[in-house]
């Protein structure tokens, strides 16, 4: 059996949803899975995160350059957490044959603080399943790194069983600092996971990482399964990643429990004269659940509201919501920054989604700079409804109706000059 066929079979066994962006060397995997085409890699990963929140394992297949496009949700996943496993299957074009640059995707493991698995000919099936298990255990996206040498090689077919062990998103009772502290604790656990992982065979001599030859085998390439004593010499396909990271150790862990709103003593909430407060209160009262974005809408994840499930970075709410809550709340700037591609994809596929765009003509949550762009100018394809934030009756009607397909509502409001987020004692 060829490595490409083994990876396809293993993914079909371990995952429920597949998204793919063709490109050498993973086009055959995308086709073999009949993966859903997506407008870009960032949107594909956000769809997968939405699947995760809904209890579905999801795989996103892309070539090395595509990993650059989805860096934001990849990094954010560890802080926000997830439920069912999400794995980015990335093919590295090492020559390159069909790429404009040579890239080693393993470095994203360090940047995003996520596990990276690089199977060899004897560990294709087990390596795929382990990537999903690690994603669930450590509540973050996993990376499965593939190379042409593995995909073209004759490999061993094993019978690894699927064992779902869903994780949990970060507790909404945690502050942002508390979520980061939680992420750090889980990240430090990756080191013991790698060192104790049975997929590795560290017996001395020259170690081969992934499909590279060696007397020992390294599969969990980030974090590496040993230091210089265990891995004195390493053969690798690409840059000397494992050799460079043999000395990496877990970070110093704070003895304090992750910070909660209760331990901090207050919640942060919207400005006192926020024009959208009526909408937010209505969503809370009706127990609406939504994917929310970076910016003011992220405050909806607070226990004060209990509306937002998670936020995976700027522009993420639309694709995440399309595969989970079917409701997204996003700011006008976030939409134009990097959310509009997801909205295009949602309308192309007619995915049910109520997309609520907060038009306050502000660029940032902290700076409040005036925006130069009006989203209405660029949303002709969506035929959006424009509703004043003060028209709570109309907004109430829109929240009541089931969404048969995509509906975009621009809620128009003007932020108070000099307004600042308020705090509420716990």
Language model features by range: what are they?
Residues 323-327, 340-342, 346-355, 364-407:
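Extended, non-catalytic scaffold segments that flank or surround catalytic motifs
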Residues 1-17, 118-296, 380, 384-426:
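Flexible, low-complexity linker and terminal segments
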Residues 17-20, 24-103, 107-110, 114-117, ...:
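Thiamine diphosphate
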Residues 73, 157, 163-165, 349-350, ...:
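A generic membrane alpha-helix/interface feature
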Residues 159-161, 307, 345-346, 373, ...:
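Hydrophobic alpha-helical segments
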Residues 30-33, 99-108, 158-159, 369-380, ...:
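Short, aromatic/basic amphipathic alpha-helical patches
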